[in-house]
Amino acid sequence: MRYVVFDTETPNRCNDRISQIGFCVVEDGIMGPERCFLVNPECSFDEFNIMLTGIRPELCRCEPDFAELWRRELEEVFSEGVLVAHNAPFDMAVLAKCLRAYGLRWKHIASYIDTVRLARRAFPTLSNHRLDTLAYRLGLELEHHDAGSDAAACAHILLACVERGAAPEDFLRGYDMRAMRTLRLANI
């Protein structure tokens, strides 16, 4: 199976724009290179998000907006695999809101897997299943809240869960990109 493991960072609490997006492809158990892009969100930044991510407005000012980046770098890759993210409902909602904000049409239903749920199966004795906790447990370097680093860590977590016997297909969900909600398996 082909997985597109991704992470988003947002400039403010609205979570309808992206200031950074990172991804890597995992196919047949092999992780491809991490890709990461700053994005001009064309909106204001909240101080909280700046402190969390380190991404300031001036870093994004000359970067492409989401629509340009989507067409140039993301749409083809994201269309050819199951999306995977850590706390995926958040990232799926951000992606759906961004597509809507820019008037971009994509799939109505996108398949996804949440590695938080997968990790709970593979690592049941951990006190929590946050990205930084799992990265530490697996000995991964993590620049938390850098979308590329978070996506790469998520990909390693996906592979570690598979090694421990967790089946990603058991955690497959659908996300209605128009209604912005997770669907039960029977509705996919």
Predicted features, each with a name:
Residues 146-160:
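Acidic, divalent-metal-coordinating active-site segment for phosphoryl/phosphodiester hydrolysis
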Residues 62, 85, 120, 179-183, ...:
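Short, surface-exposed loop/turn motifs that are enriched in glycine and acidic residues
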Residues 111-114, 172-173:
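Beta-strand segments within the central parallel beta-sheet cores of soluble alpha/beta enzyme folds
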Residues 1-110, 124-145:
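Conserved non-catalytic scaffold segment of RNase H-like nuclease domains
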Residues 95, 118, 154-158:
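Buried hydrophobic packing segments
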Residues 113-124:
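Short, flexible loop segments at boundaries between secondary-structure elements
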